[in-house]
Swiss-Prot record:
InterPro entries: Acyl-CoA-binding_prot_CS (IPR022408), Acyl-CoA-binding_protein (IPR000582), Acyl-CoA-binding_sf (IPR035984), FERM/acyl-CoA-bd_prot_sf (IPR014352). Monomer. An acyl-CoA binds at K30, Y45, G46, F47, Y48, K49, K67, K71, Y90. The lineage of its organism: Eukaryota, Metazoa, Chordata, Craniata, Vertebrata. GO terms for cellular component: endoplasmic reticulum; Golgi apparatus. This is Acyl-CoA-binding protein. Belongs to the ACBP family. Keywords: Endoplasmic reticulum, Golgi apparatus, Lipid-binding, Transport. Binds medium- and long-chain acyl-CoA esters with very high affinity and may function as an intracellular carrier of acyl-CoA esters. It is also able to displace diazepam from the benzodiazepine (BZD) recognition site located on the GABA type A receptor. It is therefore possible that this protein also acts as a neuropeptide to modulate the action of the GABA receptor. GO terms for molecular function: fatty-acyl-CoA binding. One of its GO terms (biological process) is fatty acid metabolic process. It is found in: Endoplasmic reticulum; Golgi apparatus. Residues 18-103 form the ACB domain.
Length: 103
């Protein structure tokens, strides 16, 4: 019983530490000195939405909503990726962008 409780506590602590890294990465991306490419931003957006919401749960915007459609497609490409894996990918991509563009 004690081991199971300890394991749950460790997993919970691990999740919160990981969530803190994710939140920090999201804040750092907002401070980039140079704007990343549209492709980089779309990929980052897709990972962010997958990490925070999960699989896409909205209809694709109409043809005339180009920005909305691009964001929908970026998120839809991440469909099926676990929230944890999406969070890891977001953190990794954000670190790469901070190294590339500076904050």
């Amino acid at each position: 019983m004690f081991q199971a409780h300890l394991l749950r506590g460790t997993l919970t602590l691990s999740f919160f530490l990981h969530q803190a890294d994710f939140d920090e990465a999201a804040e750092e991306v907002k401070k980039l000195k140079t704007r990343p490419t549209d492709e980089e931003l779309k990929e980052l957006y897709g990972f962010y939405k997958q990490a925070t919401v999960g699989d896409i749960n909205i209809e694709c915007p109409g043809m005339l909503d180009l920005k909305g459609k691009a964001k929908w497609e970026a998120w839809n490409l991440k469909k099926g990726i676990s929230k944890e894996d999406a969070m890891n990918a977001y953190i990794s991509k954000a670190k790469t962008m901070v190294e590339k563009y500076g904050i």
